[in-house]
Amino acid sequence: MVSSAAFESLDPQKIVRCLEGTRVDVLGQLRRWIDEENGGDSTTPNAPVFWINGSAGTGKTMLAYTFADECRRRGIPVTSFFCSRYFAERSNPNLIFTSIAHHLAQTFPSFGVRLAEVLRSNPHLASASVPYQLEELIINPLRSTHDSFRLCLIVTDALDECKDEGTTSIILSSLSRYVSEISPLKILVTSRLEQSITSVFASRSGHLNAASQRLVLHELELGVV
């Protein structure tokens, strides 16, 4: 578990929030998305995954931090992993699902009980493959405690800053396999347009293509604040 990767642990002096009156359209899209019940069609605002991508300096982390903090203030539970190439733990993609599972266990007691049972029976999951981590640490506990869950936002920011592009692609491919089962969780992903990431979202054979909304920030720079 990497507590330093959660948005609450980030130094607010180093993360600039969106100023009032800026990014109004983008934040409005995110608010509409979080307030809609999960669906699975990218043509509607209720897809369970929202992918914000763009070139360097377009404000992806600023938006992710601002929206996560806004949801927290609204009483929506937020679990987050802010990747950073400058910190070893925050650039290790193998720690993303373990950290998210830990945060979910702290937020939802029934999930925590089930997760503890899983870890007692298999204490080596922290070193398991990423797909197996997702299934055992998040999906299976979620299946058995679904009725006790409510809306929760999961933020994975700057996914492209993970040090292993191959594992980054595996993370998204694994998520694609289970995306129809994550309700009432909603997942916000931000990244640059790296091939290892865009290929998974664009794949017609996976489920992320049809279960995600997308926003390309650098295409909005001239016309949208």
Predicted feature residues:
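Conserved NB-ARC/NACHT P-loop NTPase core of NLR-like innate immune receptors
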Residues: 1-225
